[in-house]
């Protein structure tokens, strides 16, 4: 009875939550009765903790409404419900390996063993263990972990999007390494979208398009980076459309990345953009301050360097756009320290990164943020300083305040002064409000990410 009601509960939650929230947290859950207790099985600890913290009240309320005092107790566990665990499969017949392309060569000229070449592009150094997690990327990592544990399951396809250098490629390789660890014979392919195009062109030139199709449709998991480069390549899109359909029909995992939300990719057919959103779409945002510091400390530790906390915070507060920029800056600091033999101090970092820091301070000012946000929301610059409280003005103003806190080194009182002499508590409220809305509203989350990209580019 309670298990059948669970399906109704899922229906209510689907109506109440956004598509992304439902796909991320509710769809993977499995339910089973044990006595008077309804056990909800989550695929991993992250999903379990999130559901228990965010949705348990809604779930309990539903069962109380339906069953009153007879509502079951709830318990959470990790894994699959016992009755859903399959028996060990009989050994499968070994299929002949499809021809495998070798990097840099003609598609048909280099047939190779399936396992070795299918996973030849997975970088073993990119693991979940060395991926620094923060609020900006925790949903992406959680989804990637679930895919690694259960490829072809709830999150298929998985679409990760965000600016350059934020860790999307790291997650792709981490998933590939996770799948191969669990199943060493898995045929996993990672590639940039341009490589797919090149392989198809070579196949056409060599009259080998059927072999091309067999190869890409025989994989267990296909990961394609920077899918936006398919734009205006009609034949490649046509071939990928059919490859996509074939893999999904076979419950084979697909992960795609892009620098923008699927519907915002110009030059890509609507039928493809629609399919990109069939599974789960997750934004990877620029790392917040604490994550930037953690990235620097992890990188320094891996390099055998003792990086003082105050130096890590100094760099992280001034370089905000992406992980790649942070790591590049730290590499420059380490190289300068090795060449000169000087200790790594804040003054030393100022000298070593003089050009980077000057450029960043020149690009990102409160005035620049106000102008960019006003243009983005199509309001007047004067509205940023006005006392108007209508949502169409107040929300962009709050967004600009939050971005000023994130992207400049100005204090809350200084930010308030720049917004028409407002009190620092008003700025603090704006920052907290935008942080809350980024979790609740897909549109606000998108706006924030777009503005960060614009201001940091």
Curated annotation (Swiss-Prot):
Residues 91-120 are annotated as: Domain II. GO terms for cellular component: cytoplasm; plasma membrane. It is found in: Cytoplasm. Residues 1-90 are annotated as: Domain I, interacts with DnaA modulators. GO terms for molecular function: ATP binding; ATP hydrolysis activity; DNA replication origin binding; lipid binding. One of its GO terms (biological process) is DNA replication initiation. Residues 338-457 are annotated as: Domain IV, binds dsDNA. Domain I is involved in oligomerization and binding regulators, domain II is flexibile and of varying length in different bacteria, domain III forms the AAA+ region, while domain IV binds dsDNA. Belongs to the DnaA family. NCBIfam families: DnaA. This is Chromosomal replication initiator protein DnaA. The lineage of its organism: Bacteria, Pseudomonadati, Pseudomonadota, Gammaproteobacteria, Alteromonadales.
């Amino acid at each position: 009875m309670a298990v059948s009601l669970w399906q109704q509960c899922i229906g209510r939650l689907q109506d109440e939550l956004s598509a992304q929230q439902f796909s991320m947290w509710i769809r993977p859950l499995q339910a089973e009765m044990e006595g008077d207790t309804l056990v909800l099985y989550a695929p991993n600890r992250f999903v379990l903790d999130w559901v228990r913290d965010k949705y348990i009240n809604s779930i309990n309320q539903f069962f109380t409404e339906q069953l009153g005092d007879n509502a079951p107790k709830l318990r959470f566990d990790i894994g699959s419900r016992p009755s859903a665990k399959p028996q060990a499969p009989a050994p499968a017949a070994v299929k002949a390996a499809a021809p495998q392309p070798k990097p840099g060569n003609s598609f048909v000229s280099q047939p190779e063993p399936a396992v070795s070449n299918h996973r030849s592009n997975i970088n073993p150094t990119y693991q979940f263990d060395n991926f620094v997690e923060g609020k900006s990327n925790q949903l992406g990592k959680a989804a990637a972990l679930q895919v690694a544990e259960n490829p072809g399951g709830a999150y298929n396809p998985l679409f990760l999007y965000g600016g350059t250098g934020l860790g999307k490629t790291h997650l792709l390789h981490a998933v590939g390494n996770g799948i191969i660890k669990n199943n060493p014979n898995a045929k996993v392919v990672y590639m940039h979208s341009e490589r797919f195009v090149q392989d198809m062109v070579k196949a056409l030139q060599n009259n080998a398009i059927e072999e091309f199709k067999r190869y890409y449709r025989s994989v267990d998991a296909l990961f394609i980076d920077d899918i936006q480069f398919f734009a205006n390549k009609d034949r490649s899109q046509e071939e990928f459309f059919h490859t996509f359909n074939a893999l999904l029909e076979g419950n084979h995992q697909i992960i795609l990345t892009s620098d923008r939300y699927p519907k915002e990719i110009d030059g890509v057919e609507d039928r493809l953009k629609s399919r990109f959103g069939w599974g789960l779409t997750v934004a990877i945002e620029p790392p917040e301050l604490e994550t930037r510091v953690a990235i620097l400390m992890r990188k320094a530790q891996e390099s055998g360097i003792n990086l003082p906390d105050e130096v890590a915070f100094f760099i992280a507060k001034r370089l905000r756009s992406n992980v790649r920029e942070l790591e590049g800056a730290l590499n420059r600091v380490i190289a300068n320290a090795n060449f000169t033999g000087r200790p790594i101090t804040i003054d030393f970092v100022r000298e070593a990164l003089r050009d980077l820091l000057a450029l960043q301070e020149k690009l990102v000012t409160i005035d620049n943020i106000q102008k960019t946000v006003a243009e983005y929301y199509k309001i007047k610059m004067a509205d940023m300083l006005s006392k108007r409280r209508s949502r169409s003005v107040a929300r962009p103003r709050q967004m600009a305040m939050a971005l000023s806190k994130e992207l400049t080194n100005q204090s809350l009182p200084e930010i308030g002064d720049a917004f028409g002499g407002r009190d620092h508590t008003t700025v603090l409220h704006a920052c907290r409000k935008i942080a809350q809305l980024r979790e609740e509203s897909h549109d606000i989350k998108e706006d924030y990410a777009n503005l960060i990209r614009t201001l940091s580019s």
